[in-house]
């Protein structure tokens, strides 16, 4: 990509992610002047390659599975874009906080937890807005299970051929018109379990969460964390410490 005329932001909680630092290093050597960093702690390697670095207020997370920092990163960029349009999301944050707390603490049906804990593969289906993709990654780190993200209506376009009855598909805010097709293809056809994260009841088991309007993605993400935490606890897993995954997956070194 030719980024010569772009303002470039590099986000790295640790401030030592190799890909981000390598990119800023290349752009600096090419004379690029508009380079900005976003990290979760002060005095990082990334900051030395950026013209200015912003630091999240949530603090550094020790757990391998980053959660609150993921949300604050997204909020930072959403507010930045809003301000460029002469707007702001700051007034919506108190209500968003309440909605997230409810999504994190709502009781999960034990049968839902049991089904997901026993799944061979946990799939997330929905819009490509980052929520399903992020939860698929967190599934690996928190539950030690295989996962995948099925974008849009991918779930009803052939993947059922390789699915198993012990798999679970978590559908995030599905369109009502899609529910019967999902049931026909995956529940009736494969015999697997579908769970929904939604602002309204559906024909499937799941959790109903508050409607946060344009900030709904954060509530969806929190609801997914809630489910994964319950599954991890039920499996006796140390939620904060993965057996193989590292806090900084691909760390920059000077060697």
Which residues does each PLM region occupy?
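Glycine-rich phosphate-binding loops that contact phosphosugars or nucleotide phosphates
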Residues: 1-101, 160, 168-210
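Terminal peptide-recognition signature
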Residues: 9, 139, 227
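Residues at alpha-helix termini
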Residues: 29, 141, 189, 233-234
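Short secondary-structure boundary micro-motifs
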Residues: 37, 144-145, 214-215
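Residue-level detector of functional hotspots within protein domains
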Residues: 38-39, 108, 133, 154-155, ...
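Phosphate-moiety recognition in structured ligand-binding domains
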Residues: 50, 175, 185, 191-255
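Active-site phosphate/pyrophosphate-binding segments
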Residues: 52-168, 236-255
């Amino acid at each position: 990509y030719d980024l010569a005329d772009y303002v470039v932001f590099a986000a790295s909680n640790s401030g030592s992610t190799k890909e981000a630092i390598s990119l800023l290093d290349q752009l600096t050597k090419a004379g690029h002047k508009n380079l900005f960093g976003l990290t979760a702690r002060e005095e990082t390697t990334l900051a030395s390659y950026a013209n200015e670095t912003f630091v999240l207020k949530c603090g550094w997370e020790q757990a391998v599975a980053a959660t609150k920092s993921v949300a604050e990163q997204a909020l930072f960029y959403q507010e930045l874009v809003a301000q460029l349009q002469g707007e702001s999301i700051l007034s919506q944050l108190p209500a968003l906080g309440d909605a997230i707390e409810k999504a994190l603490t709502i009781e999960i049906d034990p049968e839902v937890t049991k089904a997901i804990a026993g799944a061979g593969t946990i799939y997330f289906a929905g819009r490509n807005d980052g929520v399903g993709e992020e939860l698929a990654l967190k599934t690996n780190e928190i539950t030690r299970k295989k996962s995948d993200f099925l974008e849009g209506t991918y779930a009803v376009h052939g993947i059922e051929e390789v699915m198993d009855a012990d798999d679970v598909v978590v559908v995030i805010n599905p369109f009502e018109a899609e529910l019967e097709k999902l049931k026909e293809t995956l529940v009736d056809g494969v015999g697997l379990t579908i769970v929904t994260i939604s602002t309204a009841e559906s024909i499937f088991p799941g959790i109903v969460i508050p409607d946060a309007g344009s900030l709904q993605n954060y509530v969806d993400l929190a609801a997914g964390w809630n489910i994964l935490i319950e599954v991890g606890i039920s499996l006796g897993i140390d939620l904060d410490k993965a057996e193989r995954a590292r806090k900084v997956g691909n760390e920059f070194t000077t060697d």
